[in-house]
């Protein structure tokens, strides 16, 4: 039996519940706590049925147990508004925070683009951008590694059913954080992000459109090759990530059309927006866990 790093999840909504399913399959992570604020929530009930410890007292219900239970990694799937407070309390106990809200107080992480850059930095909070960011930033990066991107615009369309109350509260933060990461991680000089919640029934699969405006005539062969290589990288942890059309070249503009199907761990397969976020968070946490297990990373308490 290999040793696993113990984890806690804050936020038993759509994202937290889907993430829990993924962590249970991880070879190096062991989820032991699920934290919520509503004792009647479906997510807390499910976690309890799986034998996970739960509290409905928010992060303050977890803090007294973290050291005794050996929790070293905490995932926050709540809301940007409460994340800073949650992170401060968790970091003070020497646990690493993986932020699945658009709070973005820590550095951005999009695994296929910059996961390796986070190795050995001793960071105690990393931000997973947003579901739209995880789906589209690899495509912007695939273009910008070939030639400069003056402007990158992404449009993420998700089913209304897959967007819970936390996501809805954070729509403005979603667009700001995603646009910022299109620039910082994707490499575009200027970024823009648009999210659409589609109420259609039956719910539609997650769809993403990426437009890149280049500074010079596109090298079509190189860009096409780079995009296909990046798609394969993302598919390693989100098998349902696929190129529907493109790259389409029109003057200086390159457009890519994507679809993301989920594994159906919690919501049905149309909710690929959950998968791309939770799989990226799990992959990021696994990298930190592997470092901890190898003795290359010792987490230190951070006092605000």
Curated annotation (Swiss-Prot):
Effect of residue 195 to A: 5-fold decrease in affinity for acetaldehyde. Increase in affinity for butyraldehyde and pentaldehyde, leading to a 9- and 20-fold increase in catalytic efficiency with butyraldehyde and pentaldehyde as substrate, respectively
Regulation: Bound pyruvate or other intermediates in the aldol addition reaction catalyzed by BphI allosterically activates BphJ reductive deacylation activity.
Residues reported in the UniProt entry to bind NAD(+): 162-170, 273
Effect of mutating residue 131 to A/S: Loss of catalytic activity. Still able to bind NAD(+), however with much lower affinity
Listed InterPro entries: Acetaldehyde_dehydrogenase, Acetylaldehyde_DH_C, NAD(P)-bd_dom_sf, Semialdehyde_DH_NAD-bd
HAMAP family per the UniProt record, alphabetical: Ac_ald_DH_ac
Oligomeric and partner information: Heterotetramer composed of two BphI (aldolase) and two BphJ (dehydrogenase).
Protein name stated in the entry: Acetaldehyde dehydrogenase 4
């Amino acid at each position: 039996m290999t040793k696993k790093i113990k984890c806690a999840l804050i936020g038993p909504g759509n994202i937290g519940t889907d993430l829990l399913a993924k962590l249970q399959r991880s070879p190096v992570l062991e989820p032991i706590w699920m934290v919520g604020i509503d004792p009647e929530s479906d997510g807390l009930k499910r976690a309890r049925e799986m034998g996970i410890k739960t509290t409905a007292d928010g992060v303050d219900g977890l803090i007294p147990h973290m050291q005794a239970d050996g929790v070293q990694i905490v995932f926050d799937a709540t809301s940007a508004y409460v994340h800073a407070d949650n992170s401060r309390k968790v970091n003070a106990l020497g646990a690493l925070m993986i932020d699945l809200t658009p709070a973005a107080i820590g550095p951005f992480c999009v695994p296929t683009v910059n996961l390796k850059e986070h190795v050995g930095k001793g960071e105690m909070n990393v931000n997973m951008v947003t579901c739209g960011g995880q789906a589209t930033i690899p495509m912007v990066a695939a273009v910008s590694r070939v030639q400069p991107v003056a402007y990158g615009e992404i449009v993420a369309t998700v089913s209304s059913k897959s967007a819970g109350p936390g996501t809805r509260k954070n729509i403005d933060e979603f667009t700001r954080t995603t646009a910022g990461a299109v620039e910082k991680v994707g490499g575009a000089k200027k970024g823009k992000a648009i999210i659409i919640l589609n109420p259609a029934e039956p719910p539609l699969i997650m769809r993403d459109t990426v437009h890149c405006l280049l500074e010079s005539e596109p090298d079509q062969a190189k860009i096409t090759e780079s995009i296909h290589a990046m798609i394969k990288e993302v598919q390693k942890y989100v098998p349902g990530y696929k190129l529907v059309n493109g790259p389409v070249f029109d003057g200086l503009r390159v457009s890519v059309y994507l679809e993301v199907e989920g594994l159906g761990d919690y919501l049905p397969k149309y909710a690929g927006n959950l998968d791309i976020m939770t799989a990226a968070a799990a992959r990021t946490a696994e990298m930190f866990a592997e470092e901890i297990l190898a003795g290359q990373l010792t987490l230190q308490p951070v006092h605000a």
